[in-house]
């Protein structure tokens, strides 16, 4: 990796966006669309791609070479479990592969709508050692149904992972995470990874699986509780299952628009809009928009329909 050493006296010294793509070619396509849109607004902002193989990624999407600054390769054992693709494992093991001191991690199923530099700088200024999209919080006295967390019943989490009555867990959407290389963020990741690998919740006890497998978010949620840690909240991505916002409202209020979940989760009203934006931007740059979102969502690691 061609990374300049971090100057610890300058908290802004090492910062960048981190994307992850491996397995299916469509994830490299999504990574390209997102990276292109980020560079559209800020050409000097560093973007790292954590992938299974730089050679494989650029073979299936040569355009990545125009938008990615740093490649970091994951070992196969951190991508697969019993020869099956395991994205959740890669996400809980992400910490050791982060190339910057201040890392804005983004799931690749999104398009950037404005310059991300102010967001990153604000998170650094606020000393947000770990920040993410928080959707709810829960203590066991509130009952077993943690409505904002779809993965498991609360009482089963408390029992399986040895949480105590005073523990509070936070439900997150891990599509966005700001991660400083520091003791607190490392502790969150280490515990989440240990539970995921060595003490996972049995799949048959999950209320909902992620693409047929383990959801990384569940293990982060529990790790917050066991570490007595409240994540810093960042509301920078628009997630939509219904037509709640106009296009102009999204552009005014958010940095990015996600097309999360499987085919049909995000209305085509929005995904078609994102494709139109990508096409128009690329036409201005004299290139062709090839990686249409519907070609990506058909192959995502997610539940097949809403």
Describe the function of each predicted region:
Residues 42, 98-99, 127, 227:
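A structural signal for short coil/turn segments at secondary-structure junctions
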Residues 1-79, 211-214, 226, 260-265, ...:
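N-terminal anchoring/stem segment of glycosyltransferases
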Residues 77-85, 139-145, 265-269:
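Short, charged, surface-exposed secondary-structure boundary motifs
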Residues 162-264:
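Catalytic core and acceptor-binding pocket of nucleotide-sugar-dependent glycosyltransferases
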Residues 54, 98-100, 180-184:
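Short loop segments at secondary-structure junctions
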Residues 33, 74-106, 113-122, 257:
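A conserved donor-nucleotide-binding helix/loop in the catalytic core
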Residues 29-32, 36, 89, 93, ...:
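A structural signal for well-ordered alpha-helical segments within the folded catalytic domains
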Residues 114-153:
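Conserved donor-nucleotide/metal-binding helix-loop-beta segment in metal-dependent transferases, i.e.
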């Amino acid at each position: 990796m061609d990374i300049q050493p971090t100057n610890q006296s300058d908290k802004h010294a090492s910062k960048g966006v981190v994307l992850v793509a491996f397995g299916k070619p469509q994830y490299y396509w999504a990574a390209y669309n997102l990276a292109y849109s980020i560079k559209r607004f800020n050409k000097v902002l560093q973007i790292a791609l954590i992938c299974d193989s730089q050679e494989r990624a650029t073979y299936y999407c040569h355009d990545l070479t125009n938008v990615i600054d740093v490649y970091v390769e994951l070992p196969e054992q951190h991508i697969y479990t019993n020869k099956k693709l395991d994205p959740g494992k890669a996400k809980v093991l992400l910490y050791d592969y982060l190339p910057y001191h201040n890392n804005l991690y983004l799931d690749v199923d999104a398009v950037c709508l404005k310059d991300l530099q102010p967001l990153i700088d604000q998170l650094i200024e606020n000393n947000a050692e770990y920040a993410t999209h928080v959707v709810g919080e829960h203590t066991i006295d509130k009952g077993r149904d943690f409505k904002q967390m779809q993965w498991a019943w609360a009482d089963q989490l408390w029992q399986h992972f040895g949480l105590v009555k005073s523990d509070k867990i936070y439900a997150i959407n891990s599509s966005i995470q700001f991660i400083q290389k520091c003791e607190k963020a490392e502790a969150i990741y280490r515990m989440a990874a240990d539970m995921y690998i060595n003490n996972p919740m049995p799949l048959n006890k999950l209320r909902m699986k992620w693409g047929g497998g383990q959801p990384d978010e569940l293990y982060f949620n529990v790790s917050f509780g066991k570490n007595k840690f409240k994540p810093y909240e960042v509301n920078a991505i628009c997630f939509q299952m219904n037509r709640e916002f106009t296009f102009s409202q999204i552009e005014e209020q958010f940095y990015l628009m996600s097309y999360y979940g499987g085919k049909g989760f995000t209305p085509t009203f929005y995904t078609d809009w994102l494709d139109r934006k990508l096409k128009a931007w690329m036409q201005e740059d004299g290139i062709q928009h090839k990686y249409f979102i519907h070609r990506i969502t058909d192959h995502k690691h997610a539940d097949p329909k809403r």
